[in-house]
Amino acid sequence: MPTNNHVQKEKFAEDRALLSQQNKEYAESLAKDIAKKEEKDKIRFEAEQKELRKKTIQDYREKLKGTVSQGPLRLLVRYPNGSRLILSFSPSQPMTSLFDAIILNPACPDYFSVRSVYPRAEIHCYPAWYHTIFNAEFKDETEKGANNVAKETNEVKCLETIPNNSILYVNLIQ
């Protein structure tokens, strides 16, 4: 027959095991709650950053309104929705002038690439600020080694890189 002291020791051991199990479950639950909160905060932060990038692009478009470029270099630009725009440039204008003229059109998506039809090539006309925003928006793809479409341009002149009367396609990047 177990003694009273032996019963107390068993009861104490059971209580201690129960308390240990409860502490373990509490710690696991707390860790899950912290992870959920961190994930929620991360999603909220990323959404805020995405909205800030979109606002930066919209503000840039507003700043450009009313600017017109003219010159002997003519380019036909086709947008993803099928609309077309004929642009004229001076041979001395930098490549970023092409970016400005393309992004100013309401048919232009926020994130895009520009390709020429012939010769088939990527046209890098992006200013540094857009390059940064683009890479932030698509950081997962660029980290996986995907082709970095929005490569920053150097100040190469339009005429040196794009033949007159070229057709350029603006491609939506998602």
UniProtKB/Swiss-Prot annotation:
Keywords: Coiled coil. Signal peptide: none annotated. InterPro entries: Ubiquitin-like_domsf, UBX_dom, UBX_domain-protein. Specifically expressed in the germline. Residues 74-120 form the UBX domain. It holds the Pfam family UBX. It comes from the Eukaryota. PROSITE patterns: UBX. The keyword Coiled coil applies. Residues 8-58 form a coiled coil. Disulfide bonds: none annotated. Forms a complex composed of deubiquitinating enzyme atx-3, adapter ubxn-5 and cdc-48.1. Interacts with atx-3 (via C-terminus). Interacts with cdc-48.1 (via N-terminus) and cdc-48.2. Probably acts as an adapter for ATPase cdc-48.1 and/or cdc-48.2, conferring substrate specificity. Unlike other UBX domain-containing protein does not bind 'Lys-48'-polyubiquitinated chain. This is UBX domain-containing protein 5.
